[in-house]
Amino acid sequence: MQSTDLKRLLIPSLLGLAIVTGSAQAAAPLRPPQGYYAPVDKFKSGDNSEGCDAMPAPYTGALQFRSKYEGSDKARATLNVQSEQAFRDTTADITKIERGTSKRVMQFMRDGRPEQLDCTLAWLSAWAQADALMSKDFNHTGKSMRKWALGSMASAYLRLKFSDSHPLATHQEQAQKIEAWFSKMADQVVSDWDNLPLDKTNNHSYWAAWSVMATAVATNRRDLFDWAVKEYKVGANQVDADGFLPNELKRQQRALAYHNYALPPLAMIASFAQVNGVDLRQENHEALKRLGERVLAGVKDPDTFEKKNGKQQDMTDLKVDSKFAWLEPYCSLYTCAPETLERKHKMQPFKTFRLGGDLTKVYDPAHEKGS
């Protein structure tokens, strides 16, 4: 048989194989990184749990909040103490459910007390029932709170949903109600943040994409997954050849802090994409790696940022270990230098409610130091 004849025979079958393989991958349920499958550490009994705090009232009002940078110029870098306090007061219940969900899930995954799980699900179910955080009446700070809250709650929930201990098996009705609410909120977050002009696309868009990625996996929605990946690529392509983000450089004395703040959502999205067969590490010539290295170098020598934008950098935020929680997913994607790993181990465990709790437990359990 001539090779051309053989090719004619093979091409349709190879095409068929490619189509089958592609559709099988597309049909595979979305999943989180392996650490989310961890079982509950131990199931304790007795009444040593801390009880269930009073539930924060479901927030169903307009998402119109004052910005902590109110009155600041375009750089949005000068804190307004009065408006920050007003913001904290009006968003207190939202922050309480974010922090409370993260805390209770961590406690339950450690102690396995049914009361901890019941408390978490009761809070989330009540907010879902009330259709909280879904107002179409919002300003920029309001839509920012919506995506932060969704990311916090959905990413903590993932540990319950995927744990090999299957804690949600006997709570299916509540789980469905909560997931339907997350799903609806993610649709609104996409609407809030989709297709912004590039000069308006910054860390907020990356955090929005993270909340949508966490929800995509919690609800197995490929359309949400694809949107989060799309937004990641926009962000990665904003990183310049030297690892700077031009829109974050505009933040003057807080430029380095905001570069660091842009990293957690990007690293988490790349990590989640990776386990679902989408490798984002190479996007824009390893943009994520370049950004991480630029920030770590900047922490060591902030002058690199001062030379870039002419402003001495405010290092306050960069003295907080949890602000470097992005190192967990980042060092699972790239081979981190020994010096970086040493820094990571000194700062562990990384607990941050906006990423769903204890990331060290998820990504580097060998270095988990307990709670």
UniProtKB/Swiss-Prot annotation:
HAMAP family according to UniProt: Alginate_lyase
Q: What does this protein do?
A: Catalyzes the depolymerization of alginate by cleaving the beta-1,4 glycosidic bond between two adjacent sugar residues via a beta-elimination mechanism. May serve to degrade mislocalized alginate that is trapped in the periplasmic space.
Residues spanning the signal sequence: 1-26
Please indicate if the UniProt record lists Lyase as a keyword.
yes
Q: Which UniProt keywords apply?
A: Lyase, Periplasm, Signal
Might you give the EC number(s) for this enzyme?
4.2.2.3
Q: Which GO terms describe its cellular component?
A: periplasmic space
Its protein name is: Alginate lyase
Say yes or no: keyword Cell inner membrane present. no
Q: Which protein family is named in the record? A: Belongs to the polysaccharide lyase 5 family.
**A Pfam family that the UniProt record links to this protein:** Alginate_lyase
User: What does the entry give for GO biological process?
Assistant: alginic acid catabolic process
